[in-house]
Amino acid sequence: MDIVLEVCDTFLFDPLYATLLPAQASSFTANATANATLSSIRQEPTAYALPHASWQYEPATKYFSIEPSKYAYMSSWPRDDWRRQALTLYLITWLFGVCVYYLFAGLSYLLVFDKATFNHPRYLKHQIKLEMKQANIAFPIMAIFTVPWFLAEVRGYSKLYDTTEKGPGRWYDYLQIPFFIAFTDLCIYWIHRGLHHPMVYKHIHKPHHKWIMPTPFASHAFHPIDGYAQGLPYYIFPFLFPLSKIASVAFFVFVNIWTVLIHDGEYAHNSPIINGAACHTMHHLYFNYNYGQFTTLWDRLGGSYRKPNDELFKRELKMCQDEWNKQAKAVDMMVEQVEGENDRSYQGEPESKKVQ
């Protein structure tokens, strides 16, 4: 995350902090400026205009560097102050998450999502607005819990490495990808399954299961603790195992995009291995199946795998009324079993039922 922090500092936060918290010139600088000749100031103006910096610039990666502008030295809050880093990382985590969410969920909605889903008997009234509202509530709160992990990374407490020479070797540069997927898939399976425990579900995980027929905007529409809990394996991994800095940033983006993809309702492949949109739709419809994030491995081993209905892969069948009615009947039974009272308000139903 130090790479992202460096880029954001250079182009956004250095000027912002320099404006809001300008540095006070030291007495040494003030005296030097007073004794300087006009010609010397003209020759080297920055020597007298900029306060003394308490930090030294070191590129976050050897693959590229961004020379700091003058603003990097003009704030009383230097780049290496942990409080500034924490605040900046909070804003990055929050705002970057929002941008990725709206960009990719929006693209998926426009280009991929089948709008016929709006006619499903278990599609909620004003569902997309409700999904966006829940996501907007979750992002800033999740960022609070996430910042300590990113701050620890930036301050050198993790096993993140920059170049191959700094890591275990070239072999690990390739192995870290399936290793990361396998580790996080295992952990998320058990975390997700734990969120379905009756003592936890109604308080934490139920908001995400409000969406029986999710749209791409349901991807991040969950309780903040729910989202943070399922993100923990990603944050923990670089403190347990080596991970390249570039891979860390790439995984951060990929995971957010993947979360959108498994909620887009486009059943592109009927894979027995990949836990794609079809498998995750089964989870939203039938609750207690397909807890995995990337693969079906742990669901198969844990006895919670449910093969997606064949009808999902045939458009003329997946959108037919008979299939929808069958799904609605099964959903109602599961809702009664898992939640008891159903407080959802479905499209086409009278206003007597309100989604809370």
From Swiss-Prot:
Its cofactor is Fe cation. One of its GO terms (molecular function) is delta7-sterol 5(6)-desaturase activity. It is an enzyme of class 1 (oxidoreductase). A motif (Histidine box-1) lies at residues 192-196. Pfam families: FA_hydroxylase (PF04116). It is a multi-pass membrane protein. A motif (Histidine box-2) lies at residues 205-209. Its EC number is 1.14.19.20. The chain crosses the membrane at residues 87-107, 134-154, 171-191, 235-255. InterPro entries: Fatty_acid_hydroxylase (IPR006694), Sterol_Desaturase_Related (IPR050307). Residues 179-303 form the Fatty acid hydroxylase domain. A motif (Histidine box-3) lies at residues 280-284. GO terms for biological process: sterol biosynthetic process. Keywords: Endoplasmic reticulum, Iron, Lipid biosynthesis, Lipid metabolism, Membrane, Oxidoreductase, Steroid biosynthesis, Steroid metabolism, Sterol biosynthesis, Sterol metabolism, Transmembrane, Transmembrane helix. It catalyses: a Delta(7)-sterol + 2 Fe(II)-[cytochrome b5] + O2 + 2 H(+) = a Delta(5),Delta(7)-sterol + 2 Fe(III)-[cytochrome b5] + 2 H2O. Pathway: Steroid metabolism; ergosterol biosynthesis; ergosterol from zymosterol: step 3/5. It is found in: Endoplasmic reticulum membrane. GO terms for cellular component: endoplasmic reticulum membrane. The histidine box domains may contain the active site and/or be involved in metal ion binding. Belongs to the sterol desaturase family. May contribute to the regulation of ergosterol biosynthesis. This is Delta(7)-sterol 5(6)-desaturase.
